[in-house]
Structure formats: C-alpha cells, structure tokens
Amino acid sequence: MDNQFIFKYSWETLPKKWVKKIEKSEHGNRFDTNTDYLFQLLCFLKLHTYTRFQVLIDICGVDYPSRKRRFEVVYNLLSTRYNSRIRLQTSADEVTRISSVVSLFPSAGWWEREVWDMFGVSFINHPDLRRILTDYGFEGHPLRKDFPLSGYVEVRYDDPEKRVVSEPIEMTQEFRYFDFASPWEQRNGNEG
C-alpha cells in the first residue's frame, strides 16, 4: 500500500467531524482536527489495520499570535508497516487544554512537556506535566512570539556560593551611540 492509498482510505473511513481540513502533497499528508477529536483520530491511525501509524516521531508547537487560536500543535506519525508518514495538526489558545496522548504513545510524555514548557500549551491527563528545558523558577514560555528578547533576570552559577543564583541584569548603559566614522581617518579634512 502506498502513502496516498492510506491517506485516501483514512479520509473515506473516518467520521467527517473528526477532520476539519486535509492536505495532500509530495512532502507528506496532513489532517487538521479539532482538539475534541484528537485522541480518537490518533487511536484510529495507530490501531486500524490499514493505517498502523504506531510510531509517534515528534510533537511540536508553533505560535501564530495573529490567530484567535494562536498555538498549533503538530503530531508527526510513522507507519513502519506501510512505510508511510502523516501529520496531524490541532490548534489551541492560552486556555484550551489538549488531551494528552501518553496513554497511546508513551514517548509523547517528553514532547508534551516540551510544548508546555516552551509555549504554555497545557495537556489534560498528562502524568508529569512540568518544565523540561527551562529552570523550575523560570517565568513565561520562551518560544512564544510575545516573550521578551532580553529578560530582566540573569540566572547563573555562582562558584564561590556553589549554587545557581538569580539576579537583575546589570546594564551599563541604556543607550549606545554608534559613530560609524573610522578612527583612522582624519577629521580635519587634511586627508592625503
């Protein structure tokens, strides 16, 4: 079975309310789904005889601040039996919680924690939803587009104290004037 057959079969077999949009391309096929049907759709794709997408390759997040549901969560699946790949996408806002798929794909635990840590997307029924890449005292979610580029707190290891310390960033100046004239050029006009 080829990738297009699996995609077409899935589309014809699935309840239509589970899928908002489909996209077929040579780079891979994609289903867009509502968060309410994400778990059921993943169950179908993993367990059905003609799909067998039993490997969850990755879960990643994307932030589109101009959208009402600004966060997109992307699930990349692989069927080793049919040598086929597919993507599932769902969207959420700051308060929408997505069903955890750890019970279906145990490896999802790490990726869901990463999406929560970096974007702030929360997962219902996750067994251990805590920070994975940033420090426990870290405030905010650094891959959001509205996250400040330069923070106000510096976290560093203090060797004499033998511990991690947080302190306000010390900026020596607020504004720096750049003079683009070369210091080797004479300024009095007597060049040459």
Curated annotation (Swiss-Prot):
GO molecular function: NADH dehydrogenase (ubiquinone) activity
E.C. designation(s): 7.1.1.2
Family matches, as InterPro entries: NADH_DH_suC, NADH_quin_OxRdtase_su_C/D-like, NADH_UbQ_OxRdtase_30kDa_su, NADH_UbQ_OxRdtase_CS
Stored PROSITE patterns: COMPLEX1_30K
Reactions performed catalytically: a ubiquinone + NADH + 5 H(+)(in) = a ubiquinol + NAD(+) + 4 H(+)(out)
Compartment(s): Mitochondrion inner membrane
Bilayer topology: Peripheral membrane protein
Keywords of this entry: Electron transport, Membrane, Mitochondrion, Mitochondrion inner membrane, NAD, Oxidoreductase, Respiratory chain, Translocase, Transport, Ubiquinone
Lineage top rank: taxon: Eukaryota
Annotated GO CC locations: mitochondrial inner membrane
Subunit-level organization: Complex I is composed of about 45 different subunits. This is a component of the iron-sulfur (IP) fragment of the enzyme.
Family: Belongs to the complex I 30 kDa subunit family.
NCBIfam families attached to this UniProt entry: NuoC_fam, PRK06074.1-5
Known role: Core subunit of the mitochondrial membrane respiratory chain NADH dehydrogenase (Complex I) that is believed to belong to the minimal assembly required for catalysis. Complex I functions in the transfer of electrons from NADH to the respiratory chain. The immediate electron acceptor for the enzyme is believed to be ubiquinone.
Record's protein name: NADH dehydrogenase [ubiquinone] iron-sulfur protein 3
Organism: Beta trigyna (Caucasian wild beet)
Gene name of this polypeptide: NAD9
